[in-house]
Amino acid sequence: MVSLPKLSAKIIIRLIYIYQIGISPILGHHCRFSITCSQYGINSIRNFGILKGCWKTCIRILKCHPFNKNDNTQ
């Protein structure tokens, strides 16, 4: 039986895939980072679990704007 956190992580990752395939091409590719924020989100959720992975993804998305002074290789 799959645990609730693992099931939730799979659902979130599927939603990110839907965004990557269905929505991102319409909006255009504007991510300033070398690994896109959506791919970073998938990797973070897989590596850190759903809570920490989603938190790290939210922080990353908040940094994804042209006025961020950090480099773009994160």
Curated annotation (Swiss-Prot):
Keywords: Cell inner membrane, Cell membrane, Membrane. The keyword Membrane applies. Pfam families: YidD (PF01809). SMART domains: Haemolytic. It is found in: Cell inner membrane. It is a peripheral membrane protein. It comes from the Bacteria. GO terms for cellular component: plasma membrane. InterPro entries: Membr_insert_effic_factor_YidD. The keyword Cell inner membrane applies. Its main location: membrane. Belongs to the UPF0161 family. Could be involved in insertion of integral membrane proteins into the membrane. This is Putative membrane protein insertion efficiency factor. It comes from Blochmanniella floridana.
